[in-house]
Each structure stands twice: as C-alpha cells, then as structure tokens.
Amino acid sequence: MTTPAPLTGLLPLNPEQLARLQAATTDLTPEQLAWVSGYFWGVLNPRSGAVAVTPAPEGKMPGVTLISASQTGNARRVAEALRDDLLAANLNVTLVNAGDYKFKQIASEKLLVIVTSTQGEGEPPEEAVALHKFLFSKKALKLENTAFAVFSLGDTSYEFFCQSGKDFDSKLAELGGERLLDRVDADVEYQAAASEWRARVVDVLKSRAPVAAPSQSVATGAVNDIHTSPYTKDAPLTATLSVNQKITGRNSEKDVRHIEIDLGDSGLRYQPGDALGVWYQNDPALVKELVELLWLKGDEPVTVDGKTLPLAEALEWHFELTVNTANIVENYATLTRSESLLPLVGDKAQLQHYAATTPIVDMVRFSPAQLDAQALIGLLRPLTPRLYSIASAQAEVESEVHITVGVVRYDIEGRARAGGASSFLAGRVEEEGEVRVFIEHNDNFRLPANPQTPVIMIGPGTGIAPFRAFMQQRAADGAEGKNWLFFGNPHFTEDFLYQVEWQRYVKEGVLNRIDLAWSRDQKEKIYVQDKLREQGAELWRWINDGAHIYVCGDARCMAVDVEKALLEVIAEFGAMDIESADEYLSELRVERRYQRDVY
C-alpha cells in the first residue's frame, strides 16, 4: 500500500525527513506505532511527568486496534468517541481509517474493534471495500488469537440493513475470531445504542487487560485530527443561500439546481471531494396535511429531547417525514390495528416494498386512524441532514460553497410529493435566506498529491458535482496532469450540466478528453459504462501511466455497471482473467488510485 500524501504545508518536516520517517515506520504493527508515538511524546515532554508507553510485557494483552469504516461520517464519530473512552480508561488504542489499514496483518491482531456503516445494496463503505474483499477472499488468514467486536450503523429504510457489519462480524467469527460482544446494529438514531455499546466495550476490555501506562493513540486517517472547525453536524453554520439556478433545460424530465451558499467570514474550509451537510425544514404544507389526516390541530404539546414543543414545530424541524421505513409501517399497523396494513406485519419483503412506494403521509391517508400527538412522534425517526458532494474549490470561489441538487418530485395518486432537502433548497429557501450547513470531510475522495498525475473522472447526472470542484482546483494549481471526463444524462440539449464550463476547460487545454453518453438521444440507450468499453485501449494506457480513477453518483446501478466495465477493460487490455482484473482493481483501490463517492 502506498502512504497517502501528507499535508506537507502543515508539517514541520522537510520532504527528506518525512520520507525517512515513513520508511522507518512502514512495517510497524499498530501496537508498535502506538509505542513509538508515546515514546516520542515522552521525549518531548520530560518535565511534564508523562510516561512513555512501553511495549506490553510478554504474555500480556497488547493494545486495541480500532478500525473506522465510514461513509457519511457517523461511524467515524462513534469510533473517535470510543477511542477517547478507551484512552480515558488508560487502555492503549490505535484508531485507523479502514482505507489506511494494512489488512494483511489482521491475523496478528489480538484485540480488534470495527465500527462500520453500510452503503448501496449492502456493500461496505468505500474505505472498507479492500478490507472486506480480502477477508472474503481465499487469501484471508485464520484468526487464532483475535478477539473482536463490531458496531454496525445502518438505516432500516433500506433492505440490506447493517449488512456490512453483519458481514464483518460473521466472517471474523468464521475465520476463528472470538467475539468480545455480540454485534450491535444501530438505526439512524444511533446515539443511545452507540453510547451503551461503547461503555460495554470499555468494561469488557478493562476486565481482560492489565491497566496500562498512560497511552497515546495513533489516529491514522482520523480526519478530526486534521480538520478542525467550530461548525459541525451538531453545531452547524447558519449561512446564506445566494444563488439557486436551474441548470437543466425547459423540456428536461429532471430539475437540477446549481446552488451557491455564502459562508461569509466563518472561516469554514473544505477540499475538493468533501461533502456539504444541509439541515432542512420539512414543508409546512406537508406537516399540515399529516396533522389534519390524524384529526390533530398542530398546537398539541409534545416532548422532544426533553423539551416541550408544539406538534407542528416538532414535525417541521425535528422529524423525518419524507422517507418511510418498514419499521414505521409495522408500528403504525400494530398501533392502529389497520385492516389494510396488518397483513403486512411479519413479511419483511412486503413491508420494505410498501415503505419504498408509500410516503408516510399517504400511508396515513390510505389507512386512516386517530393518534394522539405524542404517539405520532413516537412513530417517527429524527430528522437527519442530507449530504451533497461539493461542486466547487475554494481556490476559485473563496468563501462560497457550491452544490448540485437533483430535485426529487413525484406523484402519489395525483398528489405531488417531493424530497425533503432538495425541495427545501430548490423552492422553500429564498435567495439571501438562511440555511444551516457543515462540512463532512472525505479523505477517501481526494485529488492526487502529484499535480502531474493523470485523472479519470466518471460522473453521470449529479455525479458530475465533485469533478467541477476537481477541475477548478487543477486549473487554479496549474496542474500539468491530464484530465479525462466521462459524463452522461438523458439528453444533450436538455441535460448537459455545466456545459459551458466543460467547453471552456477543453478550449483552454485543462480538460484533455471528454466522453459523453446521452441515453435517450438515439434508439439504443448509451451509458457511461458503454463509453468506458468503447475507449478501453486508451483507458488502459492512462491507467498504465498512473492515472487515478474517480467515480461519483448512484451506488445501486451506475457504480456497479461502471466497475464491471472497468474490470472488462482491465481484463481485455491487460491480458488477465476477470479474477486477476478484480485483484488489480483492488490494488488500485488500496493505492488510492480508484476512489468512489457513491450514494
């Protein structure tokens, strides 16, 4: 595995010193890295009374390796909180990003804790794909002396709830690992479950381990050690929406908005590849409709996180109304004894299908009942922010942040419905209106550190967003590396997002190649994966020249089809079978040369 490029501008080492340090630590285990960290900290603080961490005596249990496998940041936050808990308990812990973990050393781990989310159709988060593939391959080693625990985050509105955590848990046990604790599967409202689990992990590890000397953690890839800001998911910045521009044509079936948000003098910083978290307000009209369907008024007092609020206010600001789940359907059916819904109870597939096709308000319309206000609140999930890939680079836009928003709109039996965050941004926040935002850093979707490295960008639809940021950054840096964009959408005349900008980059020689797939402009549908196969020989040449490959967009179909096409290109032009091509692509992923931001 190659070492991720450091933020050299922030380091007090020159390149030669940094290279020597990296060479000296390449083959160290997490326990050895933790000891080295503590040793140097002690050297620098001889008068503070600090005690350098010493290796565990023979026969004693070594430190804990804590792997964070995060897609939207929640798993990372849980892992960081557990790290702090373990350090407070005087236990030696190494926190490592799954993308940085040297997974071939897993058989030497004594204590292993994994905190993971799930994406797409039950796949692991991007940073954990290589580890997942290794564990499920023939190369996986027996875990003869490894004790482990898994905390899994998911969303019950998806069919493959917490599947990644289930996979890690079952495979580690199958390979011979000993469970420290039973796996915990947490829904969107994960905080209470995580807090309880963290306490149990600390207790069980304290009971197994001798008390260690005060220790230092090695947080490889833990972005909170690099990115600091007073504005977070729980304490967002109140910014100003300055531009809301429709960038699809009048006759397009899609409504895509270019949104610009003014960060003012907040000092909020981001990098190309990061996401913008947006807290939104539910549509007051939707709240009114739901309240009236339940024969309520909206002024009924309800308790939310220990505070008393009017029902309508609670529904607007604190609860998810636009995404139904199987659990909500089942609980509503049981609570109301609905004759139409009770037959679904116990049938997971039918519950999932009903939830996916019937919004909460229409479930209530089709199966009316009378609930008191607090019972309604008890059915619902807390509102969560939506994440949008950032479509700008601060090297060009400075104190602004841009996003590309596909507005979700559809009808249910003639009644207009819309996505919560997208309709909020597109239609309910006026220009110069307030919007609460934060940056979700993504160090697993970064431009190459070397500006001469070629870049291949694959982003159909709104997946184009981060590549606009990439090109702004490459242009501002004067990067000499070649750039190749694959983009697709239904129609050239209606759906060519940011067309003028791409044409300008081509004219200026910044964008060296652009391949476009218009799926509805001819009888035969053409997608970006077809363009990849069409350009297979040249694509393979770029890969051999060290190109980094980036994919952004839909995880369910597009990302799967694109990866299949890449494997076929690698197999054909690299003279490999598909299994070898898969190993090759996995190695590119480990080297950070194949990165995806899919959702």
Swiss-Prot record:
Catalytic activity reported: hydrogen sulfide + 3 NADP(+) + 3 H2O = sulfite + 3 NADPH + 4 H(+)
Highest taxon of the lineage: Bacteria
The keyword Signal is assigned to this record: no
Binding site for NADP(+): S519, R520, K525, I526, Y527, V528, Q529, D561
Gene Ontology MF annotations: flavin adenine dinucleotide binding; FMN binding; sulfite reductase (NADPH) activity
Domain Flavodoxin-like residues, every copy: 64-202
Enzyme class, UniProt record, top EC level: oxidoreductase
Residues that bind FAD: 322, 356, 386-389, 404-406, 410, 419-422, 599
Alphabetized InterPro entries for the sequence: CysJ, CysJ-like_FAD-binding, CysJ_Proteobact, FAD-bd_FR_type, Flavdoxin-like, Flavodoxin/NO_synth, Flavoprot_Pyr_Nucl_cyt_Rdtase, Flavoprotein-like_sf
Keywords assigned by UniProt, alphabetized: Amino-acid biosynthesis, Cysteine biosynthesis, Electron transport, FAD, Flavoprotein, FMN, NADP, Oxidoreductase, Transport
A GO CC term assigned to this protein in UniProt: cytosol
Pathway(s) this gene product operates in, as recorded in its UniProt entry: Sulfur metabolism; hydrogen sulfide biosynthesis; hydrogen sulfide from sulfite (NADPH route): step 1/1
CDD domains referenced in this protein's UniProt entry, alphabetically: SiR
UniProt domain FAD-binding FR-type: residue ranges: 234-448
Cofactor(s) it depends on: FAD; FMN
Signal sequence coordinates: none
Binding site for FMN: 70-75, 117-120, 153-162
Function: Component of the sulfite reductase complex that catalyzes the 6-electron reduction of sulfite to sulfide. This is one of several activities required for the biosynthesis of L-cysteine from sulfate. The flavoprotein component catalyzes the electron flow from NADPH -> FAD -> FMN to the hemoprotein component.
NCBIfam families: cysJ (TIGR01931), PRK10953.1 (NF008197)
Family of this protein: Belongs to the NADPH-dependent sulphite reductase flavoprotein subunit CysJ family. In the N-terminal section; belongs to the flavodoxin family.
Protein name, entry field: Sulfite reductase [NADPH] flavoprotein alpha-component
Organism: Salmonella paratyphi A (strain ATCC 9150 / SARB42)
Taxonomic lineage from the root: Bacteria, Pseudomonadati, Pseudomonadota, Gammaproteobacteria, Enterobacterales
Chain's gene name: cysJ
